[in-house]
Amino acid sequence: MLETHDVSRCFSTPGGQFWALKDVSISAPEGKLTILKGRSGSGKTTLMNIMGALDKPTSGKVLLAGEDIVQLDERKRALIRRRSIGYVFQSVALIPMMSAYENVEYALRLAGMKSGRRERACECLRMVGLGQRMDHMPQEMSGGEQQRVAIARAIAHKPKVIFADEPTAELDTGTGLQVVKIFKDLCAGEGITIVMTTHDTGLMEIGDMVYELQDGEIIGK
């Protein structure tokens, strides 16, 4: 279970203080897909960054398996990011000179996996339906296929939680639905907790939990 309790985030701007989040409390159940919905500037990406240990709140708690990760020092937070969390961003950012397989295998090396990297990389690419495309370079793949490689890369080190920030924003509706179906399959088959941001109302009914943000506050669930 991943939870936030009364999370607020304030940024200093030339015009004064800007509260991007205001006392946000949500829960993302284990092995389920939780969607954060909202327009640009609603606070959903700020919330995701805090939940994913990429940023700290001004106040509030973030509990991962019962532990408040806000209180951990940066070394421990970095260890959690490396071992327990996977990230999928709107910009896929695959390494262009590496094949699909090499991109995933490289992520395993960075995660410190000593053996079994080839088997795990191939397994993850098969999970996302790219078993026959492992040797293809990113420029030889469609946008949807590249995003699937990014998902394979994110799950390779067997994280507890995956954070996906607008992963379907640059995809057509059909391809976007395929990506979300992969997320649902990973929740059901691998028990991974997935938190995803989107502004696409067509994806709302697919989430197990949906929270709507506006001006840094939860306005709907």
Give the location of each predicted region.
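ABC family nucleotide-binding domain
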Residues: 2-213
